[in-house]
Curated annotation (Swiss-Prot):
It holds the Pfam family RNA_pol_A_CTD. One of its GO terms (molecular function) is DNA-directed RNA polymerase activity. One of its GO terms (biological process) is DNA-templated transcription. InterPro entries: DNA-dir_RNA_pol_insert, DNA-dir_RNA_pol_RpoA/D/Rpb3, DNA-dir_RpoA, RBP11-like, RNAP_asu_C, RNApol_insert_sf. Residues 243-315 are annotated as: Alpha C-terminal domain (alpha-CTD). The lineage of its organism: Bacteria, Bacillati, Cyanobacteriota, Cyanophyceae, Nostocales. This is DNA-directed RNA polymerase subunit alpha. SMART domains: RPOLD. GO terms for cellular component: cytoplasm; DNA-directed RNA polymerase complex. HAMAP family: RNApol_bact_RpoA.
Length: 315
């Protein structure tokens, strides 16, 4: 089967928070263009990991409807600005960023004091304006994740009650479009051409996003390559009957009956269950009285009844 080719035919990275690329994948079999395009679009939008500010703590503020003296924006507006800040974290652990600014000044993302594992994508991104004599002191939690996390879920996972939770958007891919064209070369069988457009927030390039999405799909389908259709042993997960493992000493038999069973290599109740009442009489020196004793002991102590019929495996 011939492999398709992928080509980036257009790319625009002029804006730090808006990267765009257009890809062409061809040739694909009829119908595969929609299949591949839809799968890639879904993974690009929902399964790629990104970074977001998930909570903030502002000095002197206890709720999001408060104001900070000397700051033009109220707390709710500051939270909304922090929600829009584009960051990239190289750590799987939550990180803490800090901000301490005195007015008068215009605060941007360049004022952030960030851990070495975190970088800001656009240092010019606006946060707030402070007047003369004003001061803004803030800590904010930075996390990696997928998709969208609500405030309610953030509160459930929060480790500090004085942080104000934020609806967090982790998705590094902002938008995906795809279309399928029919192509035919020299009168051959028509094929599909997939045109895929990807917009990202700058924390990842469209090429990196597409590669990651393809890797996720490969990992998802890879186990299907080695499907085993052999029947499984339905009894393998059934635990052994603990009663069957009881030694025959627990039956408190007479010495004669006990010794006869031991010489016949009957050491547990499980061994006894291989016998019928008639089979017991075939054991050397094991008479009718001993057989009745064993049958009665099994019934009385364990509620087990040996069948009467002669077994074909003990002759």
């Amino acid at each position: 089967m011939a492999q398709f080719q992928i080509e980036c035919v257009e790319s625009n990275t002029e804006e730090s928070r808006n990267h765009y690329s257009k890809f062409i994948l061809e040739p694909l079999e009829r119908g595969q263009g929609t299949t591949v395009g839809n799968a890639l679009r879904r993974v690009l939008l929902s399964n790629l990991e990104g970074t977001a500010v998930t909570a903030v703590r502002i000095a002197g503020v206890s709720h999001e409807f408060a104001t900070v003296p000397g700051v033009r924006e109220d707390v709710l507006e500051i939270i909304m600005r922090m929600k829009e800040v584009i960051l990239k974290s190289y750590s799987s652990q939550a990180q803490i960023g800090r901000l301490l600014v005195n007015g008068p000044t215009t605060i941007t993302a360049s004022h952030f004091d960030l851990p070495s594992e975190v970088e800001v994508i656009d240092p010019t991104q606006y946060v707030a304006t402070i007047a003369e004599g004003g001061k803004l002191e803030m800590e904010f939690r930075i996390e990696r994740g997928k998709g969208y996390r609500t405030v309610e879920r953030g509160r459930e996972e929060a480790t500090s009650l004085d942080f104000l939770q934020i609806d967090s958007i982790f998705m590094p891919v902002r938008k995906v479009n795809y279309s399928v064209e029919e192509v035919r070369a020299d009168g051959s069988i028509p094929k599909d051409r997939l045109l895929l457009e990807v917009w990202t927030n700058g924390s990842i390039s469209p090429q990196e996003a597409l590669s990651s999405a393809a890797g996720i799909l490969v990992d998802l389908f890879n186990p299907l390559k080695d499907i085993s259709l052999e029947p499984t042993d339905t009894n393998s997960d059934i635990p052994d009957d603990p009663t069957a493992q009881i030694p025959i000493e627990e039956l408190q038999l007479s010495v004669r009956a006990y010794n006869c069973l031991k010489r016949a290599q009957v050491n547990s109740v499980a061994d006894l269950l291989d016998y019928t009442q008639e089979d017991l009489l075939e054991i050397k020196n094991f008479g009718q009285k001993s057989a009745e004793e064993v049958v009665e002991a099994l019934q009385r102590r364990l509620g087990i009844t040996l069948p009467q019929e002669r077994s074909s495996k003990h002759n």
